[in-house]
């Protein structure tokens, strides 16, 4: 209410202060780190712009990137590096044991993209530190994305429109995202936990686990993105879309064009293309792809699981480029789609496991490793209890429900539903609230990144 009551010139200040309070509520120790990051990015951009066409401007740009990455390195990767150095004979360095600041991977990339864009001349340096601070700390997408570039909301930081229509659209998108998280992802999370803890593991229980895990991660992360985009609209911002039904893809290449779009485009524009992209010799192209995907894996987490996860996708993309990509294009959709789903099932098990051996043990369960039975009494019970949810979630992860709904809304009966829709949304909100009150604490999975 304070935001909407504030004069236009003070709206950014109100939003900035509120965003810092929101962040401090969860991470009070790291408000200073965020403020230092904001001031650093703001000052460096001004200096870079003054030296834009000189060598000193390039040097300043690299220094600004190094400063931003140093914060990420210290808080996210220091202990990972120390643990690996400690594997050397006679080395025993103490761990820093620093907790990971929430959202640091997201706002660090936003600051880096901003300073690089200023150096490239793609945007002017922001001269109002409150406006820049609002861009970095904007609370709807601060914690788990999407990764918003300065150029995405540059105009809206200066002047944005507010309307009942835009706010209503934002509320609707927020409630859809909340429902995805609470009513689908959290319940699927219950199934994954049950399958991991069952005393009667079977091949069926492991396949149920794999399917539920992929759908849980999708609805959890896309749900947060929906909530962030919805809140952004309420405050007059148009954030970029972050998902486009990735689970309907028929290749790894297509999947990553549809999944976490803001991260993929960030690595493309600020790492892959500067390295030369695909317009280089084959050896350099292979290097570029593997480097980008190992970095993508490391962005998700400081462990060899994520390095292997990212490198694996890099290898698969190279295989699709040089080996079986054309074959996939000629195959019927169902075959290429099953190929993609099989890869995603295996890769997300690696993504969610704590260690590589643990991931291999879980993947082995899919194929009966350890002489597992095909089914067990417990797995059949779980299938009866959660089978309909798995089917519903699988359908909801495709465009079919939205397409059918849009067609229905064009009919006479659909026009009546327009009047009922607010009641439906309120019902979803109340149901999600009831689930939250009755359930345990279930943070968004991408909070840890």
Q: Predicted segments — roles?
A:
Residues 1-448:
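Membrane-embedded transmembrane alpha-helical bundles that form the catalytic cores
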């Amino acid at each position: 209410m304070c935001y909407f009551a504030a004069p236009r010139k003070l709206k950014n200040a109100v939003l900035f202060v509120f965003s810092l309070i929101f962040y401090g509520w969860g991470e009070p120790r790291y408000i200073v780190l965020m403020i230092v990051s904001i001031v650093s990015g703001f000052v460096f951009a001004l200096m870079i712009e003054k030296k834009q066409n000189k060598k000193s401007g390039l040097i300043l740009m690299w220094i600004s990137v190094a400063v931003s990455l140093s914060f990420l390195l210290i808080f996210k990767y220091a202990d990972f590096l120390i643990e690996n150095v400690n594997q050397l004979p006679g080395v025993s360095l103490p761990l820093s044991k620093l907790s990971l600041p929430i959202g640091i991977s997201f706002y660090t990339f936003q600051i880096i993209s901003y300073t690089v864009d200023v150096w490239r001349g793609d945007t002017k340096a922001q001269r109002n530190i409150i406006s820049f601070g609002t861009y970095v700390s904007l609370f709807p997408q601060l914690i788990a994305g999407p990764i918003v570039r300065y150029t995405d909301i540059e105009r809206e930081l200066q002047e944005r429109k507010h309307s009942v229509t835009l706010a209503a659209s934002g509320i609707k998108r927020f409630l859809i995202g909340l429902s995805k998280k609470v009513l689908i992802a959290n319940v699927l999370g219950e199934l994954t936990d049950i399958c991991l803890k069952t005393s009667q593991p079977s091949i069926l229980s492991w396949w149920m686990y794999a399917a539920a895990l992929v759908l849980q991660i999708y609805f959890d992360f896309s749900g947060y993105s929906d909530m962030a985009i919805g809140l952004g609209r309420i405050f007059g911002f148009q954030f970029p879309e972050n998902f486009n039904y990735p689970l309907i893809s028929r290749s790894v290449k297509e999947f990553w064009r549809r999944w976490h779009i803001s991260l993929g485009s960030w690595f493309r524009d600020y790492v892959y293309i500067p390295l030369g992209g695909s317009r280089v010799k084959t050896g350099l192209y292979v290097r570029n792809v593997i480097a980008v995907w190992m970095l993508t894996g490391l962005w998700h987490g400081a462990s060899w699981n994520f390095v292997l996860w990212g490198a694996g996708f890099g290898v698969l993309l190279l295989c699709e480029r040089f080996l079986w990509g054309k074959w996939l294009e000629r195959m019927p959709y169902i075959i290429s789609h099953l190929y993609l789903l099989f890869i995603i099932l295996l890769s997300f098990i690696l993504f969610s496991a704590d260690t590589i051996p643990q991931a291999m043990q879980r993947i082995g369960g899919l194929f009966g490793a350890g002489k597992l039975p095909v089914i067990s009494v417990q797995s059949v019970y779980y299938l009866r209890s959660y089978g309909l949810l798995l089917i519903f979630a699988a359908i909801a992860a495709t465009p079919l429900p939205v397409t059918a709904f849009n067609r229905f809304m064009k009919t006479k009966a659909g026009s009546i539903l327009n009047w009922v829709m607010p009641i439906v949304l309120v019902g979803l909100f109340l149901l999600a609230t009831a689930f939250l009150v009755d359930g345990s604490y279930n943070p968004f999975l991408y909070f840890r990144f």
